[in-house]
């Protein structure tokens, strides 16, 4: 009985080894890291973000009164290569007569983060010397058009249609407005994460003059041959164990 038990345990071990050859371990997915930088609007918005992004690791660096130059500095202070999404909530305190300031700072962030996805809300700010925020929002739209995947939560359009979401100063949101703004930004973050998932899992485009089907076929044949060799070796070991078990009776 002892010899049979020993052989049984060896056989089970070999079978488990065979099964393990075809198994792949999927690492547990880490929570996506989201960096959020901004001004006083973001200070009011950010307390609600975790409610709508419960699975994300949020890093928030927002300082009231900051223009886009200063918010770029906040970005530089906080950015890590492990960040998955960058929310650049800037432009409200920029002079609307010079939309190129925001455009330049957006370009600097993009240069620093590579192909990481960005969320850039549209801007509702004060009119200065008769100039409104059209130029700044055009800069945001042009930036998004030049960079696939960029998400643009429409805060400007939201408060234009629902001005009751703003405080009496006509600039900062009331609590209900701040929560809605957080929802818009969270939707942008989710859009970024979905875009990144689609981008990283999309099949590579075949190169010119390459026969991808034949290449895949040869690879599969080689993998099958290697698997067969390994399985044959393991079965040979099982046969040796069986022979030893029988001879030892």
Say what each PLM segment does.
Residues 1-12:
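Bacterial N-terminal signal peptides that target proteins for export
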Residues 22-30:
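Bacterial Sec-dependent signal peptides at the C-terminal "C-region" and cleavage site
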Residues 30-105, 127-135:
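Conserved SGNH/GDSL esterase-like catalytic core that processes O-acyl groups on lipids
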Residues 89, 121-122:
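Alpha/beta-hydrolase-fold catalytic nucleophile elbow
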Residues 103-110, 137, 141:
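Generic structural signal for well-ordered alpha-helices
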Residues 114-118:
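A short helix->loop->beta-strand "cap" motif at the edges of active sites that frequently abuts
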Residues 126-223, 239-248:
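Catalytic His-Asp segment of secreted/periplasmic serine-dependent ester chemistry enzymes
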């Amino acid at each position: 009985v002892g010899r049979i038990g020993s052989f049984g345990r060896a056989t089970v071990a070999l079978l488990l080894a065979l099964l393990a050859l075809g198994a792949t371990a999927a690492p547990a997915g880490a929570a996506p890291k989201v960096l959020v930088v901004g001004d006083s609007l973001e200070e009011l918005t950010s307390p609600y973000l975790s409610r709508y992004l419960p699975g994300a690791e949020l890093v928030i660096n927002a300082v009231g009164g900051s223009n886009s130059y200063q918010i770029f500095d906040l970005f530089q202070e906080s950015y890590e290569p492990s960040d998955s999404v960058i929310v650049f909530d800037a432009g409200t305190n920029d002079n609307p007569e010079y939309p190129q300031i925001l455009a330049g700072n957006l370009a600097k962030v993009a240069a620093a983060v590579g192909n990481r996805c960005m969320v850039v809300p549209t801007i509702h700010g004060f009119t200065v010397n008769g100039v409104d925020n059209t130029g700044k929002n055009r800069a945001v739209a042009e930036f998004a058009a030049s960079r696939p995947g960029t998400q643009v939560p429409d805060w400007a359009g939201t408060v234009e249609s629902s001005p009751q979401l703003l405080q009496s100063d006509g600039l900062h949101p009331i609590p209900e407005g701040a929560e809605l703004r957080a929802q818009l930004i969270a939707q942008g973050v989710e859009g970024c994460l979905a875009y990144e998932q689609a981008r990283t899992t999309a099949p590579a485009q075949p190169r010119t003059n390459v026969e991808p089907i034949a290449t895949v076929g040869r690879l599969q044949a080689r993998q099958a041959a290697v698997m067969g060799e390994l399985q044959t070796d393991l079965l040979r070991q099982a046969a040796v164990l069986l022979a030893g078990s029988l001879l030892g009776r």
